[in-house]
Amino acid sequence: MTTTPILILSGKGKTGRRVAAQLDRRGVPYRLASRSSERRFDWYDESTWADTLAGVDTAYLAPPVGPTGLTQAGKFIAQARGLRRLVLLSGRGVGSPGRDFAVYDGQLELESVVQASDLDWTIVQPAWFAQNFSEDFLRYHVLAGELRLSTGTGAEAWIDTNDVGDVMTTALLDPAYVGRVLPLSGPRTLTMTEIAAELSTAAGRTISYVDLNPEAHVAEMLEQGLIQEDAEAVRDLFAVIRNHRSEYVSDGVEQVLGRPARDFTDWARETAKTGVWDQ
């Protein structure tokens, strides 16, 4: 078992928290890195990078969403002296047709930086996280009773972030996954109308889907406090769903963990019990 801590960037995000919890259960030391951690880390402040890397040789990296943040993550990897093992969180379908957007270009460039490095790398490419509806910006929509989004009639195989965390942890600790790209998804695809129906059943009240055109969606995200670059990144990520480019299932969870990925229905039912959608 490793005696040096595994670095988790960004350690307080949805996947980072779950990787940390799994490492805790296994007795593996780790170091959380974020703007509010003991060793302050900021993607946009390069003076924080060296101290964060001191004394570690293995890292899990969850980069920022927007193109600027992805560029910074690439610079960080290029300067990561002493690092030898890296597991990177990317996005499903990076490099595939129909993804001619800046955010996908940034993800593809970052993957290329990792693959061209001297690191022992693994790239994990999950579908959209189900927990966006309970822990992130989509929770607001559920509480409001309307999913005001721009995915049209396209479908996505939404994945439980706990499955992603389990795969990430396994990849960090098992050298069998060095040099591999692991696409992950839930067990079936769902349109946003179907998602709304699932959430309605789980929450015990009506939640509907309101389809916005992409630019109207950007305008609403800006009103909700997102910066322009991040709002445009979300728009472009949703455009892939809208254009029916994400309607397939990936079996990476079963390949790595030896069990099926958790279904959205089961996730929604259990999540509703926590009260996160109560009004």
Feature map (PLM): residue ranges:
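Oxidoreductase cofactor-interface core, primarily capturing Rossmann-like NAD(P)-dependent enzymes
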Residues: 2-32, 36, 44-47, 54-57, ...
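Residues lining the SAM
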Residues: 9, 62, 258
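A hydrophobic C-terminal alpha-helical subdomain
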Residues: 215-279
